[in-house]
């Protein structure tokens, strides 16, 4: 059970089954400690998430090189708890987590052109999900000479919350010390307004009508070591940006969302 969730934690005392709790906070039976979000080691290789699995005095390092999201850690902890229940070795579990891969378009870490890195979160978007993704982007360690980009397509189907939600996300980009905001499609103009109103320099904010335009701009602008978060609702088609920026576009059909004929 997720120890970090108050409602779930309350279920522990009434459960008649064997319970293994997991989480990021102290008190969980199985805990992820010393979490580090990285994207490079040595020759600009993918590094992803590093943390330590702690269970009953045993501590084992874990590296999930393909992902960059807190939700991935919770998924790994839940899977580990199941493995522990079936008496699997903690070291073997940690090794298997090295190749953990999320579904396409959900905070997947991809190598980009010019030795850059792309966090592909293009499956869909909402204010809550965008805020969580930007929080991760702000926590990733990059080289001092490199830059972080939030490349955000509009968020659809959020009704009366549309303007406020976009402005809130825009302000989070500034508050998270993200170097540049790239806003794509009409409703994303409120990303721009929110960021600038929060204090972001206008010179660091760019707007484009279409993802193809944003991709063309970024291909010329990005430099070695830069890190880009690309996110947007399905209708924003931000996977088109990722396809232009990924180091191996020939793998787009395998790695990206909406690559079927009905989308292209």
Feature roles, as predicted:
Residues 16, 57-58, 69, 81-264:
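ATP-dependent carboxylate-amine ligase
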Residues 72-77:
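Hydrophobic alpha-helical transmembrane segments
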Residues 62-70:
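A short glycine-threonine-serine/GTX helix/turn-capping micro-motif
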Residues 3-61, 103-106, 110:
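Extended acidic/charged loop-beta regions that coordinate divalent cations
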Residues 20, 63, 206-208:
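General small-molecule cofactor/ligand-binding pocket signal
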